Swiss-Prot record:
Residues 299-328 are annotated as: Disordered. A motif (Nudix box) lies at residues 127-148. This is m7GpppN-mRNA hydrolase NUDT17. The gene is NUDT17. Keywords: Hydrolase, Magnesium, Manganese, Metal-binding. Its cofactor is Mg(2+); Mn(2+). It catalyses: a 5'-end (N(7)-methyl 5'-triphosphoguanosine)-ribonucleoside in mRNA + H2O = N(7)-methyl-GDP + a 5'-end phospho-ribonucleoside in mRNA + 2 H(+). PROSITE patterns: NUDIX (PS51462). GO terms for cellular component: peroxisome. It comes from Homo sapiens (Human).
Amino acid sequence: MAEVRVQLLLSRRPESVSFARSVCGLLGAGPGLGTWPIHCSLKRGRLVLSSRPFPGASARLPLQRPPFCPFAALEERPRVPGAELPTDRGVDLGVAVILQSSDKTVLLTRRARTLSVSPNLWVPPGGHVELEEELLDGGLRELWEESGLHLPQGQFSWVPLGLWESAYPPRLSWGLPKYHHIVLYLLVISQESQQQLQARIQPNPNEVSALMWLTPDVAAAVAAAEDGTETPGLLPQDLPPSVLAVELEEDGRARPLVLHMSTLLRMIPTMAEDKERVSTGTKFALKLWLQHLGRTPPPCKSAAYLDPGPAKEEWNMDPLPPNQGSGK
């Protein structure tokens, strides 16, 4: 099916974004790391972004890009012959689900090594949003396609966390970008425990080669290993040397995998390689999840939505507009 494109409200009406332009740059992002608060209209098959409030905006979310964003780098350089990017393509919309268990762990999956885009990376389940598909439905569909998990209606709550400008290859030293997305991270909070969810997981071996559940302390260490920074963040003294994951064998059977912490803390290399690591956007999403753990306002309920009420100063507290999430 056709894919959803991202639109920006830069003047009077929403307009599509050229593939070659940095979304953060067009919205007025400075040279720093961000994040930048962005007003969003999150509707069926459509994502509209603006740096200013506008009629129909239903959320105010943090937007960020990596410090090595290739689109930002290209805009700062003079044009080089042979370095032209497509002019007939836009920026696609992706959605990723940060699935939290009732005992406060989150699910990450390792992308299969055979995938042509971002192989061997640890990421939350996610993918493209299809036309006329609710954003939550798109995230839950991707969760089901990759992990086999179906979340029954009424047994989870959810809230949008933030937006990430993504490119692949992720930096110019790897080559010119071939893919350009804005990824919407959704926090989906299940009423089931990690053990209950794990018992129902049936990973798709064509997309997933391993999976693991992160506790808040491990997630904090992973988020602190920020790509593109000169010095890593301070790590807790009591950080475990490894975490237990589940790996899929070639015949589809699962086996325990002891994953060394150094793998999870690995940063993006300068030159292209497929070493196992946590993706840069995932580190951003984990940081937002950790911030959310300390908040008191309840997230949106599945198939039941909160009244937006008065404008809030904190981003990601405004609920999505009313819709009927199918949970499929």
